[in-house]
Amino acid sequence: MTIEFSNFSFRYESLDKPTLRNINLRIEKGEKIVIIGPSGSGKSTLGQCLNGLIPHAIKGEVSGSLTINGQETATFAMHQFTEQVGTVLQDTDSQFVGLSIGEDIAFALENQLTSNIEMYSLVKATAKMVDLEQMLQRSPHDLSGGQKQRVSLAGILVDDVDILLFDEPLAALDPKTGKRTIEIIDELHRKTGKTVVIIEHRLEDVLHRHVDRIILMDDGEIMADTTPDELLASPLLAQYGIREPLYLTALKSAGCHLALDDHPSSLSELPLANYQHAMADWFHQANTTSNHIRSETLLDVRNLTYSYDGEKNALEGVSFNVQRGEFVSILGKNGSGKSTITKLIMGVIEPDDGAIYLNGQDLSELTIFERSQKVGVVMQNPNHMISHHMIFDEVAFGLRNRGWDEQQVNDKVLEVLELCGLSKYRHWPIEALSYGQKKRVTIASILALEPELLILDEPTAGQDYRNYTSMLSFIEKLNRELGITVVIISHDMHLVLEYTTRSIVIADSQLVADAPMTDVFSNPALLDQANLTTTSLYELATRLNMAETNAFMQHFIDVEKASRLEKTVERNVA
């Protein structure tokens, strides 16, 4: 089933300029392609045109043509799109319609008046394809992120559509679950021959399995339509602010030139013997002296235990502390209890046992409002934090609550919007933003209040590399120059590797590690226990037979940090 965009453009009703411009793209039946690009580049808008949300649910001006299997879609009713294109949304919770997994999978069949006997066998067979056959009676809302993704996938597979569209399927998944998701998509592609379109920021994770082509978008246009090897051998990823695989960054740092014939899209196929000497020389430049200094304790978590239902503990006897001025990560799989820690610190829920101290004061003595003046929390889902229609008003909300005059509010909001890369959107309505842009708005709202302790829950979910690097470099600067203590709750291994110094690892509701980040990242058994995975940087070090894996990883981190500092200085001078 061929998909073809011809001179296709689209402009949202609320915007003056088109979001998509002159798109010319042909996707052949059975291809698997990945669409990448910075936040706001038009990736998700292109997907919404493909699945019919534009123009049926989202209004705007369309020009050019989109054909599916040779049929012009301009005259399609919504059901004609859904009969051919199945979509797994980034926010899976918004996609569920049934009280149980079985009901949710059966929804499309019920609409088609399928008989109960046939429906039962189809639901069972589809659930088996995605490893859910033993869970049909459970509520989809009680599942982990990866399980929810599989329910959504089953809901479209049962309809036997020819085109599968995935809108950032990895955004909310831990590394091991994300890896399994890519494997499931690949297995389905190989077994069914369906056309697969994946919109995703996490390029290295998607390339865990073969893809035919990568479409690079920026500012509403297609900038490249090429193979993975051709893209990774080119300078395009850096040019458009897309994060390249870590192993490539390390090889390039050592001065290694990667040619197309080297198959740079696959670490297992790279001729590493050609780079052994250069990598050894690069590593020998490492300065292994540690400059980490412990200071006084800011956050002290003691024997924390909590259960949502009174039966199974979400946290069990967890203790750790965070020193003033540290940049720490809390790692763990979906459902391990990471976000529960945030809720307990905020005061949204109270522990069944244990206590939390900030600056030596028991947080149970403070109201939620009093805690919010000391601790800034940026939640995982931006839609759970946003309360205003316009971006400027959202960022200004906390400052106005403090009684600031409008001139002070205006100056501070503009400063923070600039730092977070949002200044050009300050007069936009929030609903016109992408998920990643909404995330930056919530972070800007918290940063405007200058908290003593900043907690970010999955800050990179839905963010492109350029925007999250800009934002976190700013947070890193606050941490370095102003001493703001930062805790990142994440399962983004790249983020943790690049920015944090110590990792607290939670698995099955318990603390399983509290150690320097490089110690954690070079322990495959520990990572597997927490549903995490080793990074390609670790795999590169082991394939190069580096005796000191930890030191190799630390040298890479130091080089990257120095590069970020240099770029910051250059921007300030400019």
From Swiss-Prot:
* Enzyme nomenclature, EC number: 7.-.-.-
Membrane topology, as annotated, equals: Peripheral membrane protein
Gene3D superfamilies for the chain: P-loop containing nucleotide triphosphate hydrolases (3.40.50.300)
Every copy of the ABC transporter domain together lies at 3-244, 299-533
Q: Which Pfam families does the UniProt record give? A: ABC_tran, DUF3744
Q: What is its main location?
A: membrane
Q: Which keywords, in A-to-Z order, does the entry hold?
A: ATP-binding, Cell inner membrane, Cell membrane, Membrane, Nucleotide-binding, Repeat, Translocase, Transport
Localization, per the record, is: Cell inner membrane
Q: Does the keyword Cytoplasm apply?
A: no
Q: Name one GO cellular component term.
A: ATP-binding cassette (ABC) transporter complex
User: Molecular function (GO) terms listed?
Assistant: ATP binding; ATP hydrolysis activity; ATPase-coupled transmembrane transporter activity
UniProt: ATP 2 binding residues: 332-339
Protein's UniProt keywords contain Amino-acid biosynthesis: no
For the ligand (ATP 1), the binding residues are 37-44
Q: Which family does it belong to?
A: Belongs to the ABC transporter superfamily.
PANTHER family in the record: ABC TRANSPORTER ATP-BINDING PROTEIN BC_2655-RELATED, HEAVY METAL TRANSPORTER
Please describe what this protein does.
Answer: Probably part of an ABC transporter complex. Responsible for energy coupling to the transport system.
Q: What is this protein called?
A: Putative ABC transporter ATP-binding protein VV2_1533
Organism the protein comes from: Vibrio vulnificus (strain CMCP6)
Q: What is the lineage of its organism?
A: Bacteria, Pseudomonadati, Pseudomonadota, Gammaproteobacteria, Vibrionales
